[in-house]
A protein has these predicted regions:
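Charged, low-complexity intrinsically disordered regions
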Residues: 1-20, 206, 279-291
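SF2 helicase/translocase NTPase motor core
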Residues: 4-53, 74-77, 81, 86-178, ...
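Phosphate-binding P-loop
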Residues: 54-61
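Walker A/P-loop
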Residues: 61-81
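Conserved Walker B
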Residues: 69-70, 164-168, 196-198
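Conserved phosphate-coupling serine/threonine residues in phosphotransfer and NTP-handling enzymes
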Residues: 98, 195, 277
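Inter-lobe coupling linker of SF2 helicases/translocases
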Residues: 138-157, 173-188, 212, 216-291
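Conserved helicase ATPase motor motifs in RecA-like P-loop NTPase domains
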Residues: 189-200
Length: 291
């Protein structure tokens, strides 16, 4: 099913809102994000404004999935959300990301949003007092979060951000996994899932991602399959119903929707296959485990 969020404003209006959020000082209650971004060093695009507003659409929401295509700035969108939580003094914030992206996240937060962060690593250990002090944003790898899930769960996180959240897509399976440990550890926290590929192999993966946010959103897996996988309904009707159900929790922007104001460089990709030697793969696995 294609998840496509309708944009109720013209491109000119969205450009104005993007400028307003980026440049204005202060702001009334109606302009929720204006004050947060008044000092942020970032040029916003209209679709990023829409994504940030979507994330705050309901005070009762347990979280959302931002599923823009690659290259549309999901990190910036998450930065806006994180900044708003920080401004509201909801400062127990954890970002779970691939190990290779932790430094990038730290730099983005500092350079674009002036937010301090600390990367949790095995060699540094964990202090529960520090995790709860709300003085900085914490960043860790998926492997670290999985290994330290019990300790991390003792902090009531105001916001947990999952970058490359498709890594959690198989959480619906009955076998214990990294995804199931993280789901349990942060079940009570507000969550923001970032992924360009919310659906890769089968529709159950979409069920899994949504269950990370709200375990009861679609009911149990058996009911979900009966309604959307093995339904007697016409496929168009079933997928139409699924899109309607996903609309409050999943926001997706496609590249073709933003070509009016985002100019892409024409590239000719060349793929070069590489197969690591046994020793190289072993070293890579050991470093990943250490991180």
């Amino acid at each position: 099913a294609t998840m496509k969020q309708e944009i109720p404003y013209s491109s000119a209006q969205l450009l104005y809102y993007a400028w307003q959020l980026s440049r204005n000082r202060g702001g009334a209650d109606d302009d929720k994000l204006t004050g947060v971004l008044s000092e942020a060093r970032v040029d916003l695009n209209p679709h990023q404004v829409m994504a940030a507003l979507f994330a705050f659409q309901s005070p009762f929401s347990k979280g959302v999935i931002l599923a823009d295509e690659v290259g549309l700035g999901k990190t910036i969108e998450a930065g806006i959300v994180i900044s708003q939580f920080w401004a509201e003094r909801k400062r127990r914030i954890l970002i779970v990301a691939p190990a290779t992206l932790r430094r990038q996240w730290s730099m983005e937060l500092e350079e674009k949003f002036f937010l301090d962060s600390f990367i949790l690593e095995k060699k540094k250990g964990i202090s529960l007092d520090h995790l709860s002090d709300g003085k900085q944003i914490y960043i860790c790898s998926y492997q670290f979060a999985s290994r330290q899930a019990e300790i991390l769960s003792r902090t009531h996180w105001d916001l947990v951000v999952y970058d490359e959240a498709h890594k959690l897509r198989n959480v619906y399976k009955s076998t214990p996994s990294m995804a199931s440990r993280l789901k349990s550890a942060f079940s009570d926290s507000h969550k923001l899932l970032l992924t360009a590929t919310p659906l890769q192999n089968n529709i159950e993966e979409l069920y899994g991602l949504v269950s990370i946010i709200d375990d009861h959103y679609f009911g149990d897996l058996k009911s979900f399959k009966a309604q959307y996988c093995y339904s007697n309904k016409n496929d168009d009707i079933a997928f139409g119903d699924l899109r309607r159900r996903l609309r409050p929790i999943v926001h997706r922007t496609l590249r073709k929707q933003v070509t009016e104001y985002v100019k892409y460089t024409s590239r000719i990709p060349m793929a070069q296959e590489y197969y690591p030697a046994v020793e190289e793969q072993k070293l890579y696995n050991q470093i990943s485990e250490y991180l």
